[in-house]
């Protein structure tokens, strides 16, 4: 059996960064609440170039125009997508419930994806 070389893993990481451009925030039932694209100022790739662990950071505030009308709202998961709506999740992660109840609340999600995954 062949082995993927470091350059192959870097190519996979580059593909993910170039194509998985949306983060979907989910509620306590893991139902979609909001999907935000990497072009939005609230979402950025924050890992070091060439790092094995990709990191996307998303910061939302209760005062955001697409959030304030949802309050109070509990967030408990996130997923990465290639498309703006519908589509299949490329990666999913659950986190401790956070209930945003006022416009002064803020949630920071640091979504980490290790390629390759090392156990």
List the model feature ranges, each with a label.
Residues 1-76, 83-119:
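Small cysteine-rich, disulfide-bonded extracellular modules of the LU/uPAR three-finger superfamily
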């Amino acid at each position: 059996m062949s082995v993927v070389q470091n350059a192959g893993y870097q190519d996979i990481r580059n593909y993910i960064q170039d194509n998985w451009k949306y983060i979907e925030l989910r509620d306590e039932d893991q139902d979609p609440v909001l999907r935000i694209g990497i072009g939005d100022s609230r979402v950025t790739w924050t890992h070091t170039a060439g790092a094995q662990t990709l990191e996307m950071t998303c910061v939302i505030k209760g005062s955001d125009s697409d959030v304030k009308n949802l309050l109070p709202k509990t967030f408990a998961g996130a997923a990465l997508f290639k498309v703006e709506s519908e589509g299949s999740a490329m990666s999913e992660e659950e986190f401790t419930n956070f209930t945003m109840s006022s416009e002064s609340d803020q949630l920071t999600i640091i979504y980490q994806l290790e390629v390759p995954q090392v156990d």
